[in-house]
């Protein structure tokens, strides 16, 4: 119907007054309108739940995302951080260092402390150092080095730690492979990552029968490295070098490799050690799949602090009662439990 202006109600003078409720209807609401051929974003939020700086940051990212969409960029190519937000200062004590440097420092301080334990046994920091040196030398002799990727297929065993530490000592990045993946997916990941080297336990050799690159059997490392000493100079990684490549689930298409540099990994290690106060007395459990980036939270920090890394056996990971008992029996002090 029509709207009629009036200035009296019941014979008394009346005047319209706008009233502001000064209250957000929801914790956060975003409205988009067009004004003079421009998109206008308005954010309404509850001040008792969010800081103004947080909302400004959200608005900035919305602007970047909207601009990328209007330029018809692919979603994965849109950077949601301004350049000044993409770097984080390292602890001055660790400036210019990488995980490899911090691990070697831990070996010097705690050579005989247990470093990694799985369902079948454990190895000390000295043993992990020697075994990973062996892996690194074999990779180096194959021409492996910085900015190169190596696949790891060994299930949830302590050999996984031997492998990824060895790969990083040789300067490269590791690509975790899950033995439960279809062979076609493993083949795609190895080809897409350009991995010319593969570290595998004999149990899973059939899964990679197609592979024509360099293969190192992790089953032989423990015995072969007993009296081993390095005879080549390793190319240690620099902070700007690639640390790992973990592939997405591929639920919306082909899996995509997500890459992280050593300096980013070091920032995460420092954050975990600071917030969890990781010490040599800790037993840190690794629960997440190695092919899920949540695994990185627990794989690295303990091995820079002299703590023990415990790898949950695959056969109990999906049994909540067994997991709870394992936590108690192993005296776990820290762990990350993402959804399965």
Question: Can you annotate each of these PLM segments?
Answer:
Residues 200, 312, 337:
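Short beta-strand and adjacent tight-turn residues that come in two discontinuous sequence segments
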Residues 179, 247, 288-289, 313-314, ...:
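Conserved donor-binding loops in enzymes that form glycosidic bonds
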Residues 256-285, 292-333:
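Conserved AMP-binding/adenylation subdomain of ANL enzymes
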Residues 1-28:
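A short, small/polar-residue-rich loop/turn motif at beta-strand boundaries
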Residues 25, 36-77, 91-266, 274-277, ...:
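Carrier-protein-dependent adenylate-forming modules in NRPS/ANL systems
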Residues 154-155, 246-249, 282, 288, ...:
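Active-site beta-alpha turn of Rossmann-fold NAD(P)-dependent dehydrogenases/reductases
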Residues 31-35:
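Short beta-strand micro-motifs enriched in acidic
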Residues 188, 196-197, 283, 332-334:
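Short, Asp-centered acidic motifs that coordinate Mg2+ and/or phosphate
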């Amino acid at each position: 119907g029509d709207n009629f202006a009036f200035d009296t109600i019941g014979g008394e003078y009346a005047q319209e007054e706008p009233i502001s409720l000064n209250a957000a209807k929801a914790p956060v609401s975003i409205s988009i309108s067009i004004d003079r051929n421009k998109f206008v974003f308005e954010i309404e939020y509850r001040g008792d739940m969010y800081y103004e700086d947080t909302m400004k940051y959200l608005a900035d990212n919305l602007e970047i995302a909207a601009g990328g969409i209007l330029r018809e960029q692919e979603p994965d190519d849109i950077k949601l951080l301004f350049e000044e937000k993409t770097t984080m200062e390292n602890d001055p004590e660790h400036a210019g260092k990488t995980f490899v440097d911090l691990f070697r420092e831990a070996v010097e301080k705690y050579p005989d402390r247990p470093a990694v334990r799985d369902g079948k046994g454990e190895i000390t920091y000295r043993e992990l150092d020697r075994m990973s040196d062996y892996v690194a030398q074999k990779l180096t002799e194959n021409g492996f080095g910085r900015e190169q990727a190596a696949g790891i297929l060994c299930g949830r065993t302590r050999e996984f730690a031997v492998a990824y530490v060895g790969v990083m000592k040789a300067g490269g990045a590791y690509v975790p492979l899950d033995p439960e993946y279809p062979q076609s997916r493993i083949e795609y990941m190895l080809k897409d990552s350009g991995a010319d080297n593969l570290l595998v336990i004999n149990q899973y050799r059939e899964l990679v029968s197609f592979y024509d690159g360099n293969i190192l059997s992790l089953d032989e490392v423990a015995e072969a490295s007993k009296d081993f000493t390095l005879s080549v100079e390793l190319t240690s990684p620099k902070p700007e070098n690639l640390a790992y490549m973990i592939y997405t689930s591929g639920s919306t298409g082909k899996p995509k490799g997500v890459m992280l540099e050593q300096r980013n990994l070091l920032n995460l290690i420092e954050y975990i050690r600071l917030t969890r106060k990781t010490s040599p007395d800790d037993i840190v459990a690794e629960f997440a799949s190695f092919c899920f980036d949540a695994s990185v939270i627990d794989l690295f920090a303990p091995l820079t602090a002299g703590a023990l890394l415990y790898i949950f056996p695959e056969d109990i990971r999906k049994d909540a009662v067994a997991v709870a008992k394992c936590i108690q029996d192993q005296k776990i002090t820290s762990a990350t439990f993402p959804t399965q």
